[in-house]
Amino acid sequence: DAEQAKTFLHQLDLGLLLEVIDVESDDLDPLEAVAVTEDYKPLDIECATVGLALLRGIRQRYPDWRLLLDGDGGDENLKDYPIEENGELTIRSVVSNSMLYQEGWGVDAIKHSATYSGGLSRGCVRTYAPAQRFGFSGLSPFTRPSLIRIAEGIPFDALTAGSTEKLYALKGELVRRGMRARYGVDFPVFEKRRFQHGALDARAFSRRFSASVDEYRAHWLSLHVAHT
């Protein structure tokens, strides 16, 4: 992630803005993330774990900072999640279902979780809760209703023509064209990666996040049982 960020800022002639937060892998604690987010889904716990480490590092470096801005909601708005990772999804179901990644399969359907209303709210908690833990107030502009409304008007089916490759490229292309039209900037676009995947190499990542969803859930339940 540091190398990609360096490349990104260098191409925009903004390299002086780069600050790297170095964290020891032993300081990444998934069970802390379970407690803070009150969740147990592995992908969310991975993201929250790395987020906690990042925010702890920022807080140590800048004790007086209070405001955070992030990009949560962008993947949901532009349907930019790997379809191959979910056996229940097809390109057709993704482009044809309104707000699929925000609210699941519909108002009357069973959601991703009995605790959260859908994927977007779960994502908001994994950012909001760690930020609150370290005294930050966050804002995710892409989750604003006005932007979601615009995203819902995008003709995904026509633009992708049944191609997952075109769907995955769509977000970067929209951002690139928008930045060029609005600011005259050639915005660098990289292949999509999850936030947490740039924090460790693959072997260290597998060791640190080896627990199953059942193990995370058992720990989550133990925290609540201990206080009843």
Spans of features found by a protein language model:
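ATP-dependent adenylate-handling active sites, centered on carboxylate activation for C-N bond formation
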Residues: 1-183, 196-210, 221-226
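Intrinsically disordered, low-complexity regulatory segments
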Residues: 210-216
